[in-house]
Regions:
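Conserved AMP-binding A3 loop
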Residues: 29-33, 158-185, 202
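Conserved AMP-binding/adenylate-forming core of the ANL superfamily
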Residues: 20-64, 68-71, 89-94
Length: 218
């Protein structure tokens, strides 16, 4: 049986070497095959660390290739994922981490000064996606040590985003999880398929915009 329609795996079966993510600043690309492999491996890591359907991860870092890999890992694991603007003050980041109940936190060496001012003692899984951070595991090492292939019981996750806080503190929007298998067409975010002629379509992901970044996936 192939991957569910309009998921990274589905597109990887058709155009594995086509770019799924293109970094606007550098031109760096992540292919559909890489996105499928890396998000699947991370999903396995998170499951092995005890995360289960309904748990929340948080991401706060600059725009980099790992950001959407992490989001897709959560999406296919039945997890909520909270994208936190990397330009917020540490106190604001701390509030969102505490409020969303994150049990895994992804950041990067570029955020070292801000991360050093956070209390992360209650978050069991800390991962640096780019570079080294004290007390954080390295993203590349986790992926290298994980088995390939998707989990056998993938479930739909979803984003947990925050309002801008213009009338007070930002408010988390904790929507109910779909409770459906990953790729269920009624509830899943979709990848716009490539046309047979190879024409690219660009999609702006909501969680990236609201986190103070923009990412285009083809």
């Amino acid at each position: 049986m192939g991957a569910a329609p309009l998921t990274p795996g589905w597109q990887a079966e058709r155009t594995p070497d086509a770019p799924a993510i293109i970094m606007g600043a550098t031109g760096e690309t992540v292919t559909y095959a890489e996105l499928e492999d890396r998000s699947s491996r991370l999903a396995r890591v998170l499951r092995a660390r005890g995360l289960s359907e309904g748990d929340t991860i948080a991401i706060c870092m600059e725009n980099n290739r790992a950001y959407l890999e992490i989001a897709w890992a959560a999406q296919r694991s039945g997890l909520r994922y909270t994208a936190i603007n990397s330009h917020l003050r540490p106190a604001e980041v701390q509030y969102m981490l505490d409020d969303c109940g994150a049990v895994a936190f992804f950041s990067s060496a570029a955020m070292a000064d801000e991360v050093a001012r956070l209390d992360l003692s209650v978050i069991p899984v800390l991962v640096s996606a780019e570079g080294d951070l004290t007390a954080f595991e390295r993203y590349a090492d986790l992926l290298a040590g994980a088995a390939p292939g998707p989990l056998g019981d993938e479930r739909e996750g979803r984003e947990m985003l925050y309002s801008s806080g213009t009338t007070g503190r930002p408010k988390g929007v904790r929507k109910q999880l779909p409770g459906t298998p990953f790729g269920d067409p009624a509830s899943a975010p979709v990848i716009v398929p490539r046309e047979p002629n190879g024409k690219l379509y660009k999609r702006l992901l909501r969680e990236r915009y609201w986190a103070g970044h923009r990412s285009l996936v083809t």
